[in-house]
Curated annotation (Swiss-Prot):
InterPro entries: Phage_tail-like_C. It comes from Bacillus subtilis (strain 168). This is SPbeta prophage-derived uncharacterized protein YomH. The gene is yomH.
Length: 252
């Protein structure tokens, strides 16, 4: 729970480093966002009175954030807090009640400083956050696939399907195939990879880089990125290499 947390971390800086603690300025029961709003895109046809759902999109939402600063409201620290909050992109935000749950947040609207004309006071602001919450990024150890084939089991304990990123170092010239046997999808395939060439795949950003050709490697891959479904996934690696996998759980 956000408002039960004593402190929080934003942009990898804990609030207590600035003398700030999370506070609730409202009385009574606490109200917090549970699930993000959804936008439903529909199509109506001339012959049917019922709409067809084209897609459903979760929208970013806003959360209020108030923190108290005790004995640190001098000009130097106020400027430091302002720099801390002055970001131009979504940054990780987590709360001490569970630091393993991460929001991606951006301060918006006016930021108010309420004080007692001394060195105490609190800051009131609004954070715009992604519609999903995330776990810490997980990176596996290096798997030895020099035998040419290996099955790896990964459990997705989140609420939705997530992309699987990876990095591998090829042993000998040849091809590499990565397939989720739990899903019926086209495998991710690399062709003509050189001995000791290192390939990085960021499935979130749809970016693939090579230690030899940089970004000029898309002719060697079919760009069928691997997806991890909820529950257990069996990942099959074909081709001699060393490989490690990267993923981040996603929560509603």
């Amino acid at each position: 729970m956000i408002r039960e947390s004593q402190y929080f971390m934003f942009n990898n800086i804990p609030s207590y480093e600035l003398g700030a603690v999370n506070v609730n300025t409202e009385g009574g029961l606490l109200e917090e966002s549970f699930i993000a709003n959804r936008t439903v895109n529909e199509t109506y046809t001339r012959l049917s009175s019922e709409p067809y759902v084209d897609n459903v999109k979760l929208e970013p939402y806003e959360i209020p954030l108030n923190f108290y600063i005790e004995n640190h409201l001098d000009e130097k620290n106020v400027r430091r807090v302002a720099r801390w909050l002055n970001v131009d992109d979504y940054k990780p935000l987590s709360f001490s009640r569970n630091l393993d749950i991460i929001y991606f947040a951006l301060p918006i609207n006016a930021t108010d400083l309420v004080h007692n004309c001394s060195n105490d006071g609190y800051v009131k602001l609004t954070m715009k956050v992604f519609p999903y919450k995330y776990g810490q990024e997980t990176t596996t150890h290096w798997f030895d696939v020099t035998s040419g084939v290996k099955n790896i089991e990964i459990e997705n304990i989140g609420d939705v399907d997530i992309p699987l990123s990876l990095e591998f170092k090829k042993i000998g010239d040849g091809d590499i195939t990565v397939e989720n046997l739990t899903l019926y999808r086209t495998p991710l395939k690399f062709t003509g990879i050189k001995h000791h060439e290192v390939i990085n795949v960021d499935s979130n950003k749809k970016l693939i880089t090579s230690s030899i050709s940089g970004y000029e490697c898309y002719d060697q891959v079919n760009e069928e990125y691997v997806i991890l479904t909820r529950g257990k996934n069996r990942i099959k690696i074909n081709g001699e290499c060393y490989i490690r996998l990267k993923y981040r759980y996603k929560y509603l």
